[in-house]
């Protein structure tokens, strides 16, 4: 059995983050216009600030189990789980048309938390090349999911907050190929390359871990 680190690339995540940020910023704009500027002259000088989220490569863990049927051949199974987290925030400061009224700024804020999760379950044959190295190939399913949570906080009207959550996912064929190197009689080094999906959902990466023989 081996336990290792997984580092994946999810190129389509950049577009998911961009689209989610744009959607939630538009939602925040509608919220602000409805709550602060629907009454003419109540608030003035709205100023918006904030930052956008950046896509990050998913990272996580890999667990692999190998069972030898004969001295040369066996079966191997693998479970991989990775996650990427990012967020964006937008703030608005307003001034009251009534200069005697004090406003707590930012008047409202919007936070978008974007989570990308990928997991896979694979199995396949293994082949012992010699006493130092074994090769294997696996196939199975890979699931990628992106979730965007929006939370708007209204600092002027305590009951005026708003939140929503949107998610999308894709299940695809996944595959992996790798090798195990015997460091000694009981410890192995395990490295593999894994891929899944296509287009915006294409996910690929490497896993590396240390295994123990029982």
Describe each model-derived feature in a short phrase.
Residues 1-67:
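Short glycine/proline- and aromatic-enriched beta-strand/turn motifs that initiate or cap beta-hairpins
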Residues 5-11, 59, 79-85, 141-147, ...:
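Transmembrane beta-strands of outer-membrane beta-barrel pores
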Residues 7, 181-182, 188, 202-214:
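Outer-membrane beta-barrel "beta-signal"
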Residues 7, 67, 125-127, 181, ...:
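Residue-level signature of outer-membrane beta-barrel architecture
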Residues 13-21, 87-95, 147-158, 201-206:
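Outer-membrane beta-barrel translocator domains and adjoining extracellular loop/strand segments
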Residues 59-63, 117-123, 173-177, 204-208:
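Hydrophobic, lipid-facing positions within transmembrane beta-strands of outer-membrane proteins
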Residues 72-75, 132-135, 181-191:
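Repeated loop/turn-to-beta-strand initiation elements of outer-membrane beta-barrel proteins
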Residues 129, 169, 195-207:
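Solvent-exposed loop/turn segments connecting transmembrane beta-strands
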């Amino acid at each position: 059995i081996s336990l290792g680190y997984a580092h994946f690339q999810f190129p389509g995540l950049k577009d998911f983050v961009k689209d989610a940020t744009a959607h939630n910023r538009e939602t925040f704009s509608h919220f602000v216009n409805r709550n602060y500027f629907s009454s003419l002259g109540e608030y003035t000088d709205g100023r918006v600030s904030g930052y956008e989220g950046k896509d990050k490569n998913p990272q996580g863990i890999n667990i692999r189990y190998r069972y030898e049927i004969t001295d040369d051949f066996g079966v191997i199974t693998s479970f991989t789980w990775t996650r990427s987290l990012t967020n964006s925030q937008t703030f608005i400061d307003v001034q009251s048309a009534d200069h005697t009224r004090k406003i707590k700024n930012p008047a409202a804020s919007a936070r978008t938390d974007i989570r990308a999760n990928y997991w896979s379950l694979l199995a396949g044959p293994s082949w012992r090349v010699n006493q130092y190295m074994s090769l294997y190939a696996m196939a199975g399913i890979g699931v990628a999911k992106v979730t965007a949570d929006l939370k708007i906080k209204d600092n002027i009207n305590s009951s005026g907050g708003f939140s929503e959550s949107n998610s999308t996912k894709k299940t695809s064929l996944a595959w992996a190929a790798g090798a195990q190197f015997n460091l000694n009689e009981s410890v192995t080094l395990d490295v593999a390359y894994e891929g899944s999906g296509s287009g915006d959902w294409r996910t690929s990466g490497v896993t590396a871990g240390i295994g123990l023989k029982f």
